[in-house]
Amino acid sequence: MLLFLQITILVYLFLLVFLYFYQRNLMYHPDENNYFNDKLSVNIEEVEISTQDGLRLLGWYHEKDIRKNKTILFFHGNAGSLENRIHKLNHFRDMSVNFLIIAWRGFSGNEGKPSESGLYEDGESAIKW
């Protein structure tokens, strides 16, 4: 019984150490593009957004009428890239909205590594843009 308890504790400790050192990979895992045939049905402008810590983030901007319409700030979410979200952006085509979608640090070719504080900074930089 004592041997079983020792092995259980060792396995548990190993699991905790593993999760601690690999948590970033488990939380922010880039995904493959599963939407190869999707095409944007609206015109977009590729933009670069500078963050306070000096990173440049890739984004796509679509403007219908900046004075008449609200602007949606859209984050592509965990994993994937901007291209993975084309099928979602096409839903904005018939709406009277402008939109800006940005790729987080570490995604879509952007430099940096994703972290909670970095994601906040990316969001604030996009809002200020």
Map each language-model feature to its residues.
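Membrane-embedded segments
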Residues: 52-129
